[in-house]
């Protein structure tokens, strides 16, 4: 099978080679490494053709035993008729409207339908990854459905030929995990995976499946194609253009349509910004891409990846491209920011897949950069180093930069082992050639892979979707490097830039270091004549005009000066043999005079020009500064006036709107009160009528006289019932008089801020509302905290009800009492409480059992008590409220909720537990229960508060002992009469005092021992 594929590839090579001209072969030899052809290669190709024909003949002449293709083909039509009868597919003989079409649903459970497996095995059209190596036959667990191009003569697909979305996802997982990440390299499996993923997309299209499963599969397929564009760009059998077209028109276009359709049904795709950015990069130089991006939703358009792609698109625009029918149009006034483009690609903001897509545009951007550099550089400059070109355009090697330049006809020379390019306006540049082949970029693209596998890239690991930093992606402060390493010396101000005489003078002047020495040793330059200048000699020399140089309009002559001028006395020596016609002194005097006069005039003119330019610049600067200052003041005054008027209008409008809103709110409240009163009256009369009708229906027909009196009594009775019901409801929701209850606490020495804690453990909102009404609680700024306060006898009493204990202040407060609402106990829970055998059973309880809910309520109570014990200063009595339709077994309640353990635990701050069972409306009067609860208020400290006080006392005690020890040592060092034994005794006294204080923590003992320590210190001071 592999041999047949290789033969087909060789045929494709030869067919492509026949179409090439001699010029193309020559260009290909420059672009790539030339291949040597020989007679042996031709013989090999002929042998492969013969072998391919033999394999084709064997393939169609032999059949496998056990192949069911003929059997399945005979049953094909019957299966189609059954599918049409069952309404699974449309009948091709009966045309329908589009809205009446049958929704096609695939039923194939395997990665490849059975009919296709048998058919391709029969036709010997299997790939080696689909064949079981042990049996040599097709394997249903390895074969994947191939892509079938739709044509007019093809038969209609059956439901058994199409895979549903779960099977399609399974097939894609197999291709990624087993084929792409398998032992074979990516270039060998690309044709297989590309065909099978295309078949997956075809099955989604046949079923019109556009849900999240289809989106996820298309996203993974798109990532695979983007990965191949980079990884296989230099492979011979790979076509990057076809891959990009398949990605752009077949996958990304479908994904964009999926995103738009799902957004209409309020479904958000998390990876939409990522693939919108890929779509922008595939149309990098399309001027319409910005307009299409602006119609995206604001959250997609503002995403950092989309903004980064738009930034790259803006930097990739060119204005020097050759105009053609299929070529992208040039962008007017484009600055050709190619260096910023490559630096942004190299930054961490660009992900690996974005760099893979951008790699296909590198050569086009580099071509435009080369044309811009050629247009800007002059022929007088030296050749441009290939190393600098490699650095600016981010080639991997210098040889790549040289090959790229040779491809477009630029001359590349070797200067002492360093390659350089003749890059200027006069250099030849072949602009008609297509873009240079795509190169595998190691520095810009492959370095971003970061040791990740292909599966991580295709499946969209977090490394590939990192949040982009805004400062990195959209910063305009990208440092710009010079197009060459060293700058040429700038021309001296006052001279023309393009005149050769001026450049010569500037070069000659640059050789002088320091001041010009007129008294330097005399020499005879080679360019000077051996006799004095004459008028004819001077007139034959073309003078150089200084631009705006002299005020009198005269021309200044600049003699040529050699670069060999130096002040080294040893190198330049006067001529010993003086010529007789001209003396050495006269010649040197004339030369020095000419040089000094010329240079002095040049320097004077330069200084004058510099001074004039400096004065002009400073004048403009002062004028511009003064103008900006005046303009700024006028502008600020105007802005201030405008802002003041706007703010005044805004304030007036806001006041009017606030008053109008208050009036509207009052009107709405009045209307609500009227509506409530009206509804209450209507409800009252409706209940009254229903009661009257019910009573009237139970009375037999009597004479008219007795019926009249009977109706009157019924009305009175109904009115009494309604009044009694109203009184019962009022008593039920009547708030508790907390003032009278708190007044009984005056006999206790409680803290000034005393808190009554209410906690609702039930999930019923009605119970929570009832508790708020009974205790007159109001919601605070916190949404989960209700509070009310009372100021009695210079004490502040608070009633707090949080949703959770974590909503309470985390500082320790005085919670004097607590009301804990357990909630409603149904019949199953009461039976569970009464059943002692079940209570003591060690078996695990299921989560849906009533006992598990009861255990959960007991654990919740224990957790609540533990948290409150840490937050309260004093111990507190606890009132538990149970709701039930009958009396409870208190013994079972006590055992299940472990009241004894709650009271006797060392960490618990519960002083007593009281239980209130509400079975009817009369039990809802909480005044008696609260009075009993408040009568059991205690001032005893909680265990955690006691520990905190002991810790404070211990630290204070240690500080006093340490201070006393320091005092004793200080006195001992200052008193010579104290012996070592006395000092040791004085030092041991605080230690013994500390030990005794540790044993006895009573306050009286502590005071006595501290007093003894003070007396000891007084004795020491007296002795001193």
From Swiss-Prot:
Residues 39-52 have a biased composition (Acidic residues). It is found in: Cytoplasm; Nucleus envelope. GO terms for biological process: mRNA export from nucleus; protein export from nucleus; ribosomal small subunit biogenesis. Keywords: Coiled coil, Cytoplasm, Nucleus, Phosphoprotein. Residues 243-433 form the PCI domain. PROSITE patterns: PCI (PS50250). It comes from the Eukaryota. The modification Phosphoserine is found at residue 841. InterPro entries: PCI_dom (IPR000717), Sac3 (IPR017173), SAC3/GANP/THP3 (IPR045107), SAC3/GANP/THP3_conserved (IPR005062). Its main location: cytoplasm. Belongs to the SAC3 family. This is SAC3 family protein 1. It comes from Schizosaccharomyces pombe (strain 972 / ATCC 24843) (Fission yeast).
């Amino acid at each position: 099978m592999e041999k047949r594929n290789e033969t087909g590839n060789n045929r494709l090579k030869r067919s492509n080679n026949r179409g090439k001209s001699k010029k193309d072969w020559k260009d290909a030899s420059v672009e790539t490494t030339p291949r040597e052809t020989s007679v042996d290669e031709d013989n090999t190709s002929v042998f492969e053709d013969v072998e391919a024909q033999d394999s084709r003949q064997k393939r169609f002449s032999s059949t496998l035993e056990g192949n069911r293709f003929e059997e399945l083909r005979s049953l094909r039509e019957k299966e189609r008729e059954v599918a049409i009868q069952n309404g699974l597919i449309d009948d091709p003989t009966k045309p329908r409207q589009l809205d009446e079409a049958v929704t096609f649903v695939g039923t194939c459970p395997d990665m490849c339908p059975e009919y296709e497996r048998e058919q391709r095995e029969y036709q010997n059209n299997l790939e080696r990854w689909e064949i079981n190596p042990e049996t040599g036959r097709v394997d249903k667990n390895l074969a994947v459905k191939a892509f079938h191009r739709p044509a007019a003569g093809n038969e209609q697909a059956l439901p058994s030929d199409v895979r549903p979305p779960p099977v399609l996802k399974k097939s894609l997982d197999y291709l990624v995990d087993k084929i792409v990440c398998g032992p074979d390299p990516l270039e060998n499996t690309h044709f297989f995976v590309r065909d099978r993923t295309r078949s997956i997309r075809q099955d989604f299209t046949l079923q019109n499946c556009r849900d999240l499963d289809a989106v996820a599969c298309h996203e993974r397929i798109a990532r695979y194609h983007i990965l191949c564009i980079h990884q296989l760009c230099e492979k011979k059998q790979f076509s990057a253009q076809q891959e990009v077209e398949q990605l752009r028109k077949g996958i990304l276009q479908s994904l964009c349509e999926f995103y738009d359709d799902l957004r209409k049904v309020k479904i958000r795709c998390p990876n939409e910004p990522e693939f919108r950015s890929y779509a922008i990069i595939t149309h990098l130089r399309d001027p319409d891409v910005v307009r299409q991006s602006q119609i995206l939703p604001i959250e997609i358009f503002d995403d950092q990846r989309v903004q980064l792609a738009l930034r790259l698109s803006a930097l990739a625009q060119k204005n020097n491209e050759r105009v053609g029918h299929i070529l992208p149009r040039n962008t007017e006034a484009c600055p050709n920011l190619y260096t910023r483009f490559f630096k942004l690609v190299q930054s961490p903001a660009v992900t690996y897949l974005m760099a893979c897509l951008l790699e296909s545009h590198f050569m086009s951007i580099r071509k435009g950069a080369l044309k811009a550099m050629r247009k800007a550089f002059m022929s007088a400059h030296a050749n441009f180093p290939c190393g600098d070109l490699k650095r600016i355009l981010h080639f991997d090697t210098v040889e790549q930069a040289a090959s790229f330049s040779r491809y477009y006809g630029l001359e590349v020379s070797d200067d002492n082992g360093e390659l350089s390019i003749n890059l200027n306006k006069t250099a030849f540049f072949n602009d008609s050639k297509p873009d240079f082949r795509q190169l595998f970029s190691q520095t810009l693209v492959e370095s971003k892979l970061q040791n990740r596998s292909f599966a991580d890239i295709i499946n969209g690991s977090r490394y590939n979707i990192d949040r982009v930093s805004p400062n990195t992606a959209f910063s305009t402060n990208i440092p710009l490097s010079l197009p060459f390493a060293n700058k040429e010396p700038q021309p001296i101000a006052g001279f023309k830039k393009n005149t050769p005489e001026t450049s010569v003078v500037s070069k000659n002047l640059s050789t002088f270091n320091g001041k010009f020495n007129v008294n330097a040793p005399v020499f005879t330059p080679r360019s000077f004549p051996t006799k004095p200048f004459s008028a004819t000699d001077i007139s034959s020399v073309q003078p150089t005009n200084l631009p705006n140089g002299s005020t009198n309009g005269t021309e200044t002559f600049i003699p040529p000066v050699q670069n060999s001028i130096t002040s080294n006395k040893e190198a330049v020596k006067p001529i010993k043999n003086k010529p007789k016609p001209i003396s050495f002194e006269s010649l040197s005097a004339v030369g020095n005079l000419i040089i000094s006069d010329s240079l002095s005039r040049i320097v004077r003119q330069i200084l004058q020009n510099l001074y004039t330019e400096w004065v002009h610049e400073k004048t403009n600067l002062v004028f511009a500064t003064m103008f900006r200052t005046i303009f700024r003041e006028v502008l600020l005054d105007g802005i201030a006036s405008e802002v003041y008027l706007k703010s005044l209008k805004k304030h007036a409008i806001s006041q009017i709107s606030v008053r109008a809103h208050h009036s509207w709110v009052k009107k709405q409240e009045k209307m609500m009160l009227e509506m409530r009163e009206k509804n209450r009256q209507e409800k009252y009369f409706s209940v009254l009528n229903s009661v009257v009708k019910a009573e009237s229906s139970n009375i037999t027909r009597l004479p008219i006289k007795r019926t009249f009196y009977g109706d009157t009594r019924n009305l009175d009775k109904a009115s009494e019932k309604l009044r009694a019901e109203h009184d019962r409801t009022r008593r039920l929701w009547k708030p508790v008089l907390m003032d009278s209850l708190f007044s009984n606490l005056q006999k206790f020495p409680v803290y000034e801020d005393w808190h009554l804690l209410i906690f609702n453990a039930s999930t019923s909102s009605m119970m929570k509302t009832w508790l708020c009404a009974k205790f007159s609680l109001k919601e605070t700024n916190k949404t989960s905290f209700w509070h009310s306060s009372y100021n009695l006898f210079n004490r502040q009493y608070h009633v707090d009800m949080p949703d959770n204990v974590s909503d309470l202040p985390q500082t320790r407060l005085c919670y004097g009492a607590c009301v804990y609402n357990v909630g409603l106990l149904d019949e199953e829970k009461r039976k569970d409480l009464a059943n002692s055998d079940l209570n003591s059973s060690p078996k695990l309880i299921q989560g849906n059992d009533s006992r598990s809910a009861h255990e959960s309520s007991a654990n919740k109570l224990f957790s609540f008590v533990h948290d409150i014990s840490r937050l309260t200063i004093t111990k507190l009595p606890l009132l538990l409220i149970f709701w039930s339709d009958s009396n409870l077994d208190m013994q079972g309640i006590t055992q299940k909720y472990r009241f004894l353990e709650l009271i006797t635990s060392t960490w618990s701050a519960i002083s007593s537990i009281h239980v209130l069972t509400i079975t009817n409306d009369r039990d809802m009067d909480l005044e008696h229960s609260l009075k009993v609860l408040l009568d059991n208020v205690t001032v005893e400290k909680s265990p955690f508060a006691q520990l905190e006080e002991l810790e404070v006392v211990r630290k204070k005690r240690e500080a006093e002992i340490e201070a006393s020890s320091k005092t004793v040592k200080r006195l001992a060092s200052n008193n010579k009469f104290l012996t070592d034994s006395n000092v040791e005794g004085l030092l041991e006294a605080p230690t013994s005092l500390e030990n005794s204080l540790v044993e006895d923590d009573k306050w009286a003992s502590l005071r006595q021992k501290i007093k003894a320590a003070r007396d000891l210190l007084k004795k020491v001071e007296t002795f001193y």
